[in-house]
């Protein structure tokens, strides 16, 4: 299905380019900058085979990466390198892609290469911190985050990752502060507010957690089933079974398996709650 869609887009683009005098690589980059990643892939595919082949592979790789096509992205990053793409950003982008594919040691090689070439760029340190976090090396992750924030003190994702590290080290007050900073620097990073609420539940501050989760419900994020699950959990600990079961029912209808289990075991059979496993680094 993806192939047929791409074939249609390529046919359309060929006629469009013929009439507008734009090069395929120019159009591909325009589509990428505008967030039209499928169209970018189609235009870059037309550009491959022309003089801009190496650049087109890199552009197509970036679009695949944005769409979550990590294997296709890595293949195109490698093709870009083979065809002579020499921009230092290749190492950073390919390293990030390898992290997404859990190729951590290979990712480290690319990121360290980029760090050697561009030692003053905050994203390189941030992604090395991400790699260490994925390897459960919290202290090493925090060291890279110190470097990240020394270069860019407004790097919202770095505060978010530092908060995740702190939470896993049970330094909850510091984690709460960093989730708040992440949200201040990027108000769209609603996962920061969500994770703060989850932490507050673990700290027994149920009313504060419910307040944050109720705000999130109104903001209707794409993880609303999790919001409802955890608000149900907070209500359960406050002995509001009716409220808890209402939230779990709605969460279950949205596909949350833990909510489905709670409806059966806690609301139906009056058993004890088995809390959902906490994770703090999802975006």
Indicate residue ranges for each PLM-predicted region.
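Structural signature of tandem alpha-helical TPR/SEL1-like repeats
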Residues: 35-42, 67-79, 101-113, 135-147, ...
């Amino acid at each position: 299905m993806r192939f047929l869609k791409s074939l249609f887009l390529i046919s359309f683009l060929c006629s469009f380019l013929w009439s507008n005098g734009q090069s395929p690589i120019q159009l591909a980059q325009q589509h990428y900058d505008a967030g039209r990643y499928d169209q970018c892939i189609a235009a870059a595919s037309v550009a491959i085979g022309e003089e801009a082949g190496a650049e087109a592979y890199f552009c197509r790789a970036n679009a695949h990466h944005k769409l979550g096509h990590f294997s296709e992205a890595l293949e195109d990053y490698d093709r870009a390198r083979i065809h002579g793409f020499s921009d230092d950003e290749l190492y950073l982008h390919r390293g990030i892609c390898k992290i997404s594919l859990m190729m951590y040691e290979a990712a480290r090689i690319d990121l360290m290469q980029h760090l050697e070439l561009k030692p003053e760029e905050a994203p390189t340190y941030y992604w090395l911190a991400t790699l260490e976090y994925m390897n459960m090396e919290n202290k090493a992750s925090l060291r890279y985050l110190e470097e990240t924030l020394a270069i860019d003190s407004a790097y919202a994702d770095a505060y978010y990752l530092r908060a995740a590290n702190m939470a896993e080290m049970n330094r909850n007050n510091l984690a709460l502060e960093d989730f708040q900073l992440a949200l201040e620097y990027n108000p769209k990073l609603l996962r920061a507010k969500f994770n703060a609420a989850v932490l507050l539940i673990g700290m027994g501050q149920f009313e504060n957690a419910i307040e944050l989760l109720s705000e999130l419900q109104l903001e209707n994020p794409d993880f609303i089933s999790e919001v409802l699950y955890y608000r149900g959990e907070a209500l359960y600990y406050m002995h509001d079974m009716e409220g808890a079961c209402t939230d779990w029912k709605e969460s279950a209808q949205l596909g949350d398996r833990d909510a489905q289990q709670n409806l059966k075991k806690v609301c139906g059979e009056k058993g004890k709650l088995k809390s959902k496993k906490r994770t703090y680094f999802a975006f």
